[in-house]
Amino acid sequence: MAAARPALTDSLSFCLAQLTAAAGEGPGGGKDPATNETPLGRALLALRTRHIKAAEGIERFRARGGLRPLLALLRRTAAAGPAPSQAASGSAPSSVASAGSTPGHAPAAESLLTPSLPMRLRKTLDLALSILANCCTEGACRAEVRRLGGILPLVTILQCVKTDSIQNRTARALGNLAMEPESCRDIHSAGAVPFLVESLTACQDSQCLQSIVRALRNLADSPQHRLALAQQGAVRPLAELLATAPDPALTAALVRALLELSRGCSRACAEQLSLGGALGPLVSLASHPKRAIREAAILILANLCAQGLVRPALGNAGGVEVLLGELRRRRSPGGSSSATQQPLVRAVCLLCREAINRARLRDAGGLELLMGLLQDPGASAWHPRVVAALVGFLYDTGALGKLQALGLVPLLARQLCGEAGEEEEEGIEAASWDFPEERTSGQAEGGSFRSLRLWLISEGYAAGPGDISPDWSPERCPMPEPSESVSPTPGQTSMSTPRTLRKPGRIPAATPEEPWGQEGPALLLLSRFSQAPDPSGALVTGPALCGLLAYVTGAPGPPNPRALRILARLTCNPACLEAFVRTYGAALLRAWLVLGVSPDDWPVPHARPVHRSQHRELGEMLLQNLTVQAESPFGVGALTHLLLSGSPEDRVACALTLPFICRKPTLWRRLLLDQGGLRLLLTALTQPAPHPLFLFFAADSLSCLQGLVSPTASPVPLPALPLELDSPPPCLYEPLLGPAPAPAPDLHFVLDSGLQLPAQRAASAAASPFFRALLSGSFAEAQMDLVPLRGLSPGAAWPVLHHLHGCRGCGAALGPVPPPGQPLLGSKAEEALEAAGRFLLPALEEELEEAVGRIHLSPRGGPESVGEVFRLGRPRLAAHCARWTLEPGQCPRKRALALTGLVEAAGEEAGPLTEALLAVVMGIES
């Protein structure tokens, strides 16, 4: 049997020839498609079903030049149509209406464009549009269609032919073309959006609606295009369809389109979504079983939060609970990455701007969620935004109490000096809708307003035209926080209201402006907490005080005055006095502000911004505030109770703090001296430190107390012993060492090394009871010319022999003393001191101790030598060490380092150190 003869339409060339002929571009062209529909229809059908769908068929069709006649065919049907104003309410560009067409073709075109198209012509147009839409799935074809001007015919067909199938394929072709940014721009310029919107409202076919929705989604490829779509009313029909769409496929397409249109949500987009009734359906879709629809709906709700006008309605629809639940799910251990949490965090923070949504958020556990974000180091980039959101709860007493219980205050204090991400700037549309603005157009600004604005700028009340709007009113402006009196001292002004940085060219304002930087929201919340009747539990703690002080001293410019007012408010509150004592807060204020030593600067100093005079003034003012509280009847009772009946830790803290905040002699003498506060503090030095700066605080406290006990004491440096004297005392032992000694020695002391040292028997016996008994008594050594001295090295024996022969101040006592930096334990100096005690030479002991003190405890000496000297265990040297440590005028850091060395040297034997320090403080040292 013979094989079947191949059809003509199996040939791509035949199909292209038919297409070219129908388009009027080849031999015999210009035939009316209505009279030539049968061969053309077969060719178009073959192109769509076989040639285009074959492997690389679209590329072959494009390479063989098929797009040009295809577009020409579409152009012929679209060019001679009625004016756009007659066909639709929208308007197409004039180029569409003026496209050229031959008079002979007009009747056919008119018949094509009638509302009831002939079946064959409609089928031809359907096939041609289907082929074009399929071809536009590839980038090369999209580029060529745009180059050949194929967008305008599609817009005209969309405008004029209202058949669902043709609208469907036209929208599909436009949607495919919109995948290229250049084509998307041309489609917008061609005026396709109004016709797509019109078709969206008129069409009933689900497939057609999906194609139109997809085209609108692809046209929303940039912020400018999204805004244009919203301004042309494309969002509301989508929202209305979402509220009534029964088709799951259409619902998915609508959600995807609305997600794209709501990115960077504009005011017009939010208004249309709300008016279209989409908020409720979106909240319902947030629990859809399909993940793609569910997540898209949630992201649309998150995007809508950028517009304040829609947030109250969004909360009424249940959006607050949906967003909180999704953010909680994504932050769970099995949740998603932080990048997917960002839009939800932003949305939840924006929801805190309206009171009604804050109430819903609080009831739905949103405060705990926000606190979890603040406690998460991995979410540090969002911390400024979260803190700014919590400012909305500033006057919600219940929420503030919960936030305080959850540990907000230490997190805020850490926020003041931490390196966190910057808060993203929001537009004016994101402002709270609790006080909606009456929008005034620029054209409506009257001359009176312009005159007012110019006057405000000239007087310095506004920096520029943008600082004040026509909608400004005194009711909308928050009153500045009053600068309350913080201290009766006259030195409070400069730090309580520091100068603000002035921008170049800025006219000084009549009232100083408070800087509002990244720390502004945190300080506002801390200020609110400080206004509580008893804020000590939250703010008078180590972390809170450290955060405030780190901000005040570390700010590159003048700190925010609110931080200074917080500190002043706390120190003026009697309810905070005990907390300042228990937490070493007063000592911290003095160390950080007055002395310039922070916890990070101890024991190794670190470079940081220095404004010492202003900081010192602030510290003295705050301590004066605490002094006023401490010396009041309430303060006296509180301190007495704390010292006598408090816990051991509180008693030590009270004893340490009293010299800083008590100036009345009757008070500090009774508490520290009569009731044992000083001895309690000294005993605690050798116990585990309750604070990282405890020894620094203790050294400073003892020095202050010494100044209170002896207020007229002034630094009296010890006279340095010159190593080379201009007229040294004569050495009485040196004549015995020459080749011709005079007088001649009558005995020699023999050391363990065999060295023989000459001596006079009578002088040695007269200088020491030990040698008197040894050399003049009944011992065998009294009859010997070579007397052994066991356990004595030459270096240690040298000052002994000099002293036995009457040398005083000849420099021999300095010989065994090592230079600073070398240990004294095990040195010749220690051996000489032991020998002086063994040989009953107290004057030599004193001379050696004085030599050690003058070399290692000179005014220019280092604190590391103090502990070395104390380790020798000599009472006089211990007193010398205590005197050097607490010497008036001593550097605070050196004093603290010296006390640290003394504590380490004392070990568990605290008695000698306690007695030495007590004697120096009380001024009773011998």
Curated annotation (Swiss-Prot):
> Could you tell me one molecular function GO term of this UniProt entry?
ubiquitin-like ligase-substrate adaptor activity
Keyword annotations for this protein, in alphabetical order, are: Chromosome, Cytoplasm, Nucleus, Phosphoprotein, Repeat, Ubl conjugation, Ubl conjugation pathway
Q: How is it modified after translation?
A: Ubiquitinated by a BCR (BTB-CUL3-RBX1) E3 ubiquitin ligase complex, leading to its degradation. Deubiquitinated by USP7.
Give a yes or no for keyword Repeat in this entry.
yes
What do mutants without this gene show? Embryonic lethality, with its severity depending on genetic background of the mice: embryonic lethality becomes more severe with higher degrees of genetic background purity. Knockout mice are small in body size. They have compromised T-cell proliferation and differentiation into Th1 and Th17 cells, increased T-cell apoptosis, reduced severity of experimental autoimmune encephalitis, and defective immune responses to lymphocytic choriomeningitis virus infection. They develop adrenal gland hyperplasia in old age.
User: Which ranges are annotated Low complexity under compositional bias?
Assistant: 82-104
Q: Where is this region: Disordered?
A: 82-111, 472-516
| Cellular localisation | Nucleus; Chromosome; Cytoplasm
Pathway given for this chain reads:
Protein modification; protein ubiquitination
- Sites bearing Phosphoserine, chain numbering: 337
Lineage: superkingdom = Eukaryota
GO cellular component, as recorded: chromatin; Cul3-RING ubiquitin ligase complex; cytoplasm; cytosol; focal adhesion; membrane; nucleoplasm
Found, by tissue, as follows: Expression is high in the thymus, stomach, bone marrow and lymphatic tissues (including lymph nodes and intestinal wall). Also expressed in the adrenal gland, skin and in brain structures, with noticeable levels found in the cerebellum.
Task: Give start and end residues of every ARM repeat.
Answer: 139-179, 181-221, 223-263, 267-306, 307-354, 355-399, 401-440
- What turns on this gene? In CD4(+) T-cells, mRNA expression is induced 2h after CD3E plus CD28 stimulation, then subsides and remains low between 24 and 72h post-activation.
Signal peptide region: none
One GO biological process from the UniProt record? Answer: in utero embryonic development
| Description of how the protein assembles with itself and partners | Substrate-recognition component of the BCR(ARMC5) E3 ubiquitin ligase complex, at least composed of CUL3, ARMC5 and RBX1.
Q: What is this protein called?
A: Armadillo repeat-containing protein 5
Origin species = Mus musculus (Mouse)
Gene symbol?
Armc5
